């Protein structure tokens, strides 16, 4: 089946695969409302429909990503609502049984987030947590009672801070999946910088990805 992955749009990677695996473990009702934050090419939103959800909303700040996700949904003949906007802003006031998030999380020399270009899909400030922390603060209000947040990121930007912030927001959070994968092009190009900051060991060539599962129990 044709799946579009144009330049400048985040294509499915190892983190996408790990999050899709965690998604596959979630029992979804047909009427479940699912949100895919930072959808990129739409791969995870499409996976949610294939997993049984019939009400899937995907969000991305990039116009190119939004158009790509819409085209991929049309090519797959699967019903997905795709909205353009920053993170959770387009769906304020709505509730979801499942939120999927694969945000930018790579530590970068620049403190500010890039405003355009492909790097918006991975650069996340000096500590890699600028976008992660916004999701940790904002996602709980969008979860229906019993709703679940599945959030994937690299251990380079800290697993415990994510768990702590989600728990502080009233969610029950734990690590659901872990996987070590070889550095991709971005981390290979940034290895010297990460090594200089003590985030990786000299000569290290793999990173650990984690999926955090957080549930709104009340």
Predicted regions and their residues:
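SAM-dependent Rossmann-like transferase core, predominantly class I methyltransferases
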Residues: 1-51, 62-68, 89-90, 189-218
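Conserved Class I SAM-dependent methyltransferase catalytic core
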Residues: 8, 129-187
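Residue-level signal for inorganic ion chemistry
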Residues: 16-19, 102, 135, 149
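Conserved acidic residues
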Residues: 32, 97, 147
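Conserved SAM-binding motif I beta-strand of class I
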Residues: 55-60
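Conserved SAM-binding strand-loop segment of SAM-dependent methyltransferases
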Residues: 77-87
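A short acidic, Gly/Pro-enriched loop at the edge of an enzyme's catalytic core
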Residues: 88-99
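Mobile active-site "lid"/loop adjacent to the S-adenosyl-L-methionine
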Residues: 103-131
């Amino acid at each position: 089946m044709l799946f579009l992955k144009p330049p400048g749009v985040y294509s499915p990677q190892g983190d996408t695969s790990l999050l899709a695996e965690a998604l596959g473990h979630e029992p979804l009702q047909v009427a479940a409302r699912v949100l895919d934050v930072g959808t990129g090419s739409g791969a995870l939103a499409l996976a949610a429909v294939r997993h049984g959800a019939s009400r899937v909303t995907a969000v991305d700040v990039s116009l190119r990503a939004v158009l790509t996700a819409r085209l991929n949904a049309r090519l797959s003949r699967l019903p997905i609502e795709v909205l353009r906007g920053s993170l959770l802003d387009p769906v304020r006031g709505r509730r979801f049984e499942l939120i999927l998030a694969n945000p930018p999380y790579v530590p970068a020399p620049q403190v500010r987030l890039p405003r355009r270009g492909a790097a918006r899909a991975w650069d996340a400030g000096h500590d890699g947590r600028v976008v992660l922390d916004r999701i940790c603060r904002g996602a709980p209000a969008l979860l229906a009672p019993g709703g679940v947040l599945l959030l994937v990121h690299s251990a380079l930007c800290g697993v415990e801070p994510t768990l702590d912030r989600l728990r502080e927001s009233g969610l029950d959070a734990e690590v659901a999946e872990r996987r070590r994968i070889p550095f991709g092009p971005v981390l290979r190009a940034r290895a010297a910088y990460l090594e200089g900051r003590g985030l990786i060991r000299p000569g290290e060539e793999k990173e650990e990805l984690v999926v955090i599962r957080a549930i709104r129990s009340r």
